């Protein structure tokens, strides 16, 4: 790819931007790792992150954890959940997890469905582990490299739609994933469910903070994953000191509502007993 094309698509700074914590590192090397990790995992919100992860930084500085484990702490943190988990639809969260943790976009419906299944069966932390402790992560980043955007270059196992899809998700360095046009909606669901490539639209103005001009990709569940799930939960007694008998409740929801219902139950102080597919 020519440098002019990369610049027009606002991906020049992202290509091959690899940060590794090598042996005999200096404090400057460590600070580069911190900055790269915060920007990769949180995007624009990363400017607020350093104050929230001083303990994790100390663990990495003292050799108690690896770069991979540092990334794991960030992705499982309440701050990451506040930025992306609580605010977004299930599919949008999966898109962002692929972007932040593997440096690419999901290629097809099966990759999205796999993470829906993991989340439904084993919860949020297990789903994050499925990215960070995958063979793909191991081969791409190992224990010492901060995840970076690999999808702009040819990578092992890459599908031809990969470049188009990551262009739709990336939208410029340091952008806000939550401030793009489309907000909390999936950017890829329609094209992924129809097995079609995304069009490539350059950001609206090169050299600035970019916002996608692409239309929001919204489709009904019948065009994507139309599975239904049953959530069994024990009702919570949040914000009350009165002893009450907790009732068992059952929710039948589409996979698009799975994440939102999960969050609502926990916010009310409930406990999820089981999630199963209908």
From Swiss-Prot:
Top-rank taxon, per record: Bacteria
User: Which keywords annotate this record?
Assistant: Antenna complex, Membrane, Photosynthesis, Phycobilisome, Thylakoid
List locations, semicolon-separated.
Cellular thylakoid membrane
Which SMART domains does this entry report, sorted A to Z? CpcD
Ranges for domain PBS-linker come to 2-178
Q: Has keyword Thylakoid?
A: yes
Tell me the InterPro entries matching this sequence: CpcD-like_dom (IPR008213), PBS_linker_dom (IPR001297), PBS_linker_sf (IPR038255), Phycobilisome (IPR016470)
GO biological process: any one?
A: photosynthesis
Q: Does the keyword Repressor apply?
A: no
Q: Where is the CpcD-like domain?
A: 226-278
Function of the protein:
Rod linker protein, associated with phycoerythrocyanin. Linker polypeptides determine the state of aggregation and the location of the disk-shaped phycobiliprotein units within the phycobilisome and modulate their spectroscopic properties in order to mediate a directed and optimal energy transfer.
Q: Which family is it part of? A: Belongs to the phycobilisome linker protein family.
Q: How does it associate, per the subunit comment?
A: Associated with the phycobilisome, a hemidiscoidal structure that is composed of two distinct substructures: a core complex and a number of rods radiating from the core.
Q: What protein name applies here?
A: Phycobilisome 34.5 kDa linker polypeptide, phycoerythrocyanin-associated, rod
Gene name, Swiss-Prot/TrEMBL? pecC
């Amino acid at each position: 790819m020519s440098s002019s094309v990369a610049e027009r698509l606002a991906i020049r700074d992202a290509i091959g931007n690899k940060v590794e914590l090598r042996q005999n590192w200096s404090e400057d090397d460590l600070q580069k790792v911190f900055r790269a990790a915060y920007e990769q995992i949180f995007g624009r919100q990363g400017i607020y992150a350093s104050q929230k992860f001083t303990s994790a930084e100390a663990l990495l500085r003292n050799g108690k954890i690896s770069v991979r484990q540092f990334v794991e702490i960030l992705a499982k943190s309440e701050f990451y959940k506040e930025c992306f988990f609580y605010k977004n639809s299930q599919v949008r969260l999966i898109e962002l997890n692929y972007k932040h943790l593997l440096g690419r976009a999901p290629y097809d419906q099966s990759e999205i469905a796999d993470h829906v299944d993991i989340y439904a069966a084993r919860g949020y932390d297990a789903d994050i582990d499925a990215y960070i402790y995958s063979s793909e992560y191991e081969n791409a980043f190992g224990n010492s490299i901060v995840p970076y955007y690999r999808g702009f270059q040819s990578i092992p196992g890459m599908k031809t739609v990969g470049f188009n899809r990551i262009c739709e998700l990336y939208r410029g360095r340091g952008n806000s994933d939550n401030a793009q046009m489309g907000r909390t909606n999936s950017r890829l669901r329609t094209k992924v469910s129809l097995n079609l490539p995304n069009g490539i639209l350059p950001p609206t103005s090169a050299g600035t903070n970019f916002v996608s001009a692409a239309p929001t990709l919204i489709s009904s569940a019948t065009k994507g994953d139309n599975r239904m799930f049953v959530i069994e939960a024990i009702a919570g007694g949040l914000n009350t000191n009165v002893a009450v008998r907790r009732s068992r409740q059952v929710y039948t929801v589409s996979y698009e509502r799975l994440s939102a219902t999960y969050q609502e139950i926990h916010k009310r102080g409930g406990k999820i007993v089981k999630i199963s597919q209908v």
